Amino acid sequence: MTTRALALRDALARLRDPGALEAFSAVAGEPLFAVELDGDPGDAAVPVALAQLAAPTVALVRDPEAPAARRFARHFDVVVASESELGCVDAAVRATPIASAVLAQLLRFGDPRTIEAGLIAESLAYSALQAGPEFRAWLAARPVSPAPRSASEAPLRVRRDGASLHLTLDRGAKRNAYSAALRDALVEALQLAASDDTIAQVVLDGAGPAFCAGGDLDEFGEAPDPATAHAIRTTRSAARLLASVRDRALVRVHGACVGAGIELAAFAGRVVAREDAWFQLPELSMGLIPGAGGTLSLPRRIGRQRTAWLALSGVRLDAATALRWRLVDAIE
């Protein structure tokens, strides 16, 4: 079944129905609320009603200058320009409706007062999904990796050059997948940067063909329980530390910049991409949401609707589009 965008008049009628909260939900009724914004703008109560829905809300906007679009589009979780884009979001939401709803609800909170508040909210939501059926199904379907792990590999190269601290992700054989060991090494290096005011610049890049291919999938599901996982994420947070040195941080990205790769990079004051860089948020397909700070760092750069589009659609974003959206600051 594919969601069809409701005409504005029909959508307004549905939103006035006291049963709308259950009619559009991941656990009852339709998992997506899609509306074509054309015609008379109508009811001013639309923004309030949209915020109450448990399902992601999508505005189909063919003409951005239409009165309804100008008045209401900003209140939806995602804005799409065509039926094909709507279909892309619809397929993702139907595959993992609970994770999709949690993402939309989290992004609706808007910009928190502090970095810590945003990271805690994201981690709590992420932990809830770690215990959910969609993530468990993804884990069960994933083949076990036969590759043994090397306990001796150094995941991060650290070099001091005058007033600059250079950090290089160095798991090239795994496309710099963000493992627990890499997180710990990055946290230690960023703690140094945060505590040493003689470090004028922190430069972060990656060795090998990719900046970072996202979380190390071989470690997914290894946390003893979701509560402990939340405690670990909020105790050892590279995102929080990178944000604390934001004004001194330069991140250079190339190749795959996936999941945690772009989530962390987006906290830096300046992100420079090579032309071959591409960006993706694949977590929804695993029954999760971005969990390395992305629900905080990306909206601050590109807004919540574009963040939701990236996460819900799973599309790859090229460097030119990333620059146009201001996800990166330059292409070199």
List each model region and its residues.
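A generic structural signal for short coil/turn motifs at secondary-structure boundaries
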Residues: 175-178
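A structural preference for short, pocket-lining loop segments at secondary-structure junctions
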Residues: 20-35, 56-58, 63, 162, ...
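Active-site-proximal gating segment of KS-fold condensing enzymes and close homologs
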Residues: 229-233
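Crotonase-fold acyl-CoA enzyme core
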Residues: 63-93, 243-332
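Charged catalytic carboxylate motif
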Residues: 102, 181, 185, 234, ...
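Amphipathic alpha-helical segments at domain termini/boundaries
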Residues: 1-46, 52-166, 309-332
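Short, active-site-adjacent cap segments at secondary-structure transitions
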Residues: 105, 209-212, 258
